[in-house]
Amino acid sequence: MGMRVDIVTLFPEMCQQVLDASILGRAAKRGYIETHCHQIRDYTLNKQKQTDDYPYGGGCGMVLYAQPIADCLRAVQQEVAAQGRPAPHIVFLTAGGQRYTEEHARRLAQYDNLTLVCGHYEGIDERVIDAFADEEISIGDYILTGGELASLVVADSVLRLKPGVLAEQKGYEEESYLSLIHISEPTRH
């Protein structure tokens, strides 16, 4: 069984399309990794499938409800357990999270299961973060419209470290980020 990555998002089609393409897509087809994207709206309890509301204390923007995210995470945990896997390591992608580095990628690659939760709008109700997060990560000091791109950055950087994903295992060990000096790399043709 390869590493499993789940992404909890309002835009699962967007994320799955990227994960199914290129190197990660080939690795998934060969069974080296497994990726799943989950629609938060599928877990709402209202007819409108609304996932957000105004912040309790006022202020601008909308905040994602805790309930549908919590229910989605419970469903992911049950699905992972049904496969006989250990509980997933749950990471929330937030602007206030710890700055993501290659060291994080290498550490996260040690888990069998990783669940990435994408924020959107003004953020996520803090209660669900407090209840489920093993950690919070930010990919940089800038704001995106949602956590989908951040989750894909994390997923790609972690999954490429897993055996069988890259054609040559040495590929990830000899990348230019490991050296302070970067040389020009022309093609052979």
Walk through the language-model features, giving the residues of each.
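Hydrophobic/aromatic beta-strand patches that form the interior of the parallel beta-sheet core
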Residues: 6-8, 36-38, 91, 114-115, ...
